[in-house]
Amino acid sequence: MDYYHTRKVRILNGAHTSSVLAAFLAGSNYVQDIVCSEKVGSGFNTPNADAQKFMHDIIFNEIVPSIDGDQEDLKKYAQDVWTRLQNPFNPHRLIEISLNSVAKYWTRCLPSVLQSIKKNGSVPKLLGFSIAALIAFYNGTEIKENAKGQKCLISKREEGEYENLDTLPVLEFFAALNKETKDAKVIANKVLSNVDFWKEDLTKVAGLEAAVAGHLADIQSKGMKKALAEIVK
């Protein structure tokens, strides 16, 4: 992957995948709910300041510094991305962006996590939280066929149920795991050690399992809105 493709995948695509699941679980429905601080457009926007700070800081404080290359160029590109995301006339639904999130996370976000750990010797706080949010997003126990004939995991957030769309093996893995246990440590271990997801055993990455399990426990006990508000302080 060349520099410019890496820049796009890690910053533009990675910004979406690392941020939208936490924002969705906290009640947001559109990208503009995250990036716009005031109501804009035709009424779809419900501003979430915590989700906005989470997405902004994960881009500029964790993703950009993790990428090898000219940091000034990367920051400029990131600012262009941030400006583009704020376009109120091009709304993107978070539930649609969430399609196949496990594979997307592996491609777009995991390299930033691992590079950050390699460079700094510690798990990046917000990216670590984003893995926990990914796991929390797949919280259902029942797979059903939706109105379009697609298999989906019926998951829940405070606002109600939603259809989680992914490949059947991913849905079956989470449905079985959630039936088996609610223990954040066990769930984090099972997900991170799934080589089919990550092409490696992420429990072997120093500090990652403990960090993700801790964030997941916070999400479970406090709810995403409070956990997100606390992580961005």
Language model: regions and residue ranges:
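Non-transmembrane, aqueous-exposed alpha-helical and coiled segments at domain scale
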Residues: M1-K233
